[in-house]
């Protein structure tokens, strides 16, 4: 599982070092895809393949679901960590997420999110009240 917030830098070649504590959990291979709220989502490859297959099976008759699966599949980029624990973030993904040199990598329980640092700060500030107030339905699953 993935927890925590880290602030690695994107280098000039578009490489990003993932936190050491996430590397073992990612195992052999990972998938980088467009995420929600202009972030990137990083999944262990095996987990992503299970989720993608499930999503594809459910989407055959629903136009919105088909569009989601198409976008997900089209944005999927298979990666392997290099010897220094880095991934190469494609230009398409950097543009989508607005990534600059300053990035934020967060654990989101069963996957990782990569954000532009400024975008993450804006998102966090905008949603702080939502978190503080809590949602009874969401809290009930945690407490």
Curated annotation (Swiss-Prot):
This is Transcriptional regulator MraZ. One of its GO terms (molecular function) is transcription cis-regulatory region binding. PROSITE patterns: SPOVT_ABRB (PS51740). Residues 5-47, 76-119 form the SpoVT-AbrB domain. Keywords: Cytoplasm, DNA-binding, Repeat, Transcription, Transcription regulation. Coiled coil: none annotated. GO terms for cellular component: cytoplasm; nucleoid. It is found in: Cytoplasm, Nucleoid. It holds the Pfam family MraZ. GO terms for biological process: negative regulation of DNA-templated transcription initiation. Forms oligomers. Belongs to the MraZ family. PANTHER family: TRANSCRIPTIONAL REGULATOR MRAZ (PTHR34701:SF1). It comes from the Bacteria. It comes from Corynebacterium jeikeium (strain K411). The keyword DNA-binding applies.
């Amino acid at each position: 599982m993935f927890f925590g917030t880290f602030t690695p830098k994107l280098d000039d070649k578009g490489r990003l070092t993932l936190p050491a504590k996430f590397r073992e959990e990612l195992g052999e291979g990972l998938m980088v895809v467009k995420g929600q709220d202009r972030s990137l989502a990083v999944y262990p490859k095996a987990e992503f393949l299970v989720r993608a297959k499930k999503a594809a099976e459910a989407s055959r008759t629903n136009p919105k679901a088909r569009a989601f699966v198409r976008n997900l599949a089209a944005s999927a980029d298979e990666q392997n960590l290099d010897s220094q624990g880095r991934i190469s973030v494609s230009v398409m993904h950097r543009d989508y997420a607005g990534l600059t040199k300053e990035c934020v990598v967060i654990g989101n329980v069963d996957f990782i999110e990569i954000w532009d640092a400024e975008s993450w700060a804006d998102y966090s500030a905008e949603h702080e009240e939502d978190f503080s107030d809590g949602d009874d339905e969401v809290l009930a699953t945690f407490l």
